[in-house]
Amino acid sequence: MSGDRMTSMRIPVTKTPKVYVGGAFIRSESGRTFPARDANGEFVANVPQCTRKDLRNAVEAAAKAGPSWAARTPYNRGQIIYRLAEMLESRADEMNAALRQFSRDWTDGAEQEVALTVDRLVHYAGWADKYEQVLGNANPVAAPFFNFTITEPMGVIGTIASDAFPLLGLVSQAAAAIVSGNTVVALSFSLARSLVGSAAPARYPSRPCRPPSRP
C-alpha cells in the first residue's frame, strides 16, 4: 500500500476546544457542544455550549482574581498588557489564518484587524499609568480641608464583543477595563469560533491576561 493511499485513509483528528475560566481551560458544565464550521460550511470542531453555571463560575473566578490585579501598580499592569501586544504581534499570521477561515468577509481585513488589535493593546498599555492623572482632580472647596477625585476599580466587568470585528472588539473592551484594575468576563461567539481553527492563538493570551497572584 502506497504512502499516499495510507495518508488519504486517515481519520481527521479535530481539536476539541475548552472554555477559558480563571486562568485554565475547562470543559463546560453541561458537557454539550455545537459544531463550528468554516466559511465553506466544513466542520472544524465541536465548541462547548456553556450554561448559566459556567457564566457564574466565570464571574466568581474574575471576582476572586480582582483584588490581586487591582493591587498591582499601574505601571505593572501596563507591562502585562504590552506583553500581550508583543505576543499577539509575534503570532499575527496564525491569528490572520484563524480569522480568514471562518468568514469570507475577513479575507482582506483580517491582517488589518490583527494589526489594529496590537496597536490598541499598546495604546492602553501606555494609558495604564496616565489615566489617573487625567481623570483625577483636586476639587476647590471653600473650607479648611482638601477634596480629591480619584479613580477606583469597579470590579467585574461583563463585555460582549461585536461579531463584525471579533478580535478587535473583544480586545478593545477588555483592555479598557483591565487597564484600570478591573477584571473581565468576555463573550465573543465569532472569536471563539475562529480560535478553534488555530490552537496556538487561543492559548497565548492566557498567561499575560491572567491576573497572577502577587508574590
Q: What spans do the regions from the language model cover?
A:
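Glycine-rich loop-to-alpha-helix module at the N-terminal edge of alpha/beta enzyme cores
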Residues: 41-132
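Alpha-helix N-cap/helix-start motif
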Residues: 29, 55, 92, 110, ...
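Terminal low-complexity tails and localization/encapsulation signals of metabolic enzymes
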Residues: 1-47, 79, 83, 115, ...
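A generic structural motif
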Residues: 32, 50-51, 191
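Conserved small-residue-rich beta-alpha loop and adjacent elements
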Residues: 135-206
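A short alpha-helix capping/helix-coil boundary motif
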Residues: 11, 64, 74-76, 96-97, ...
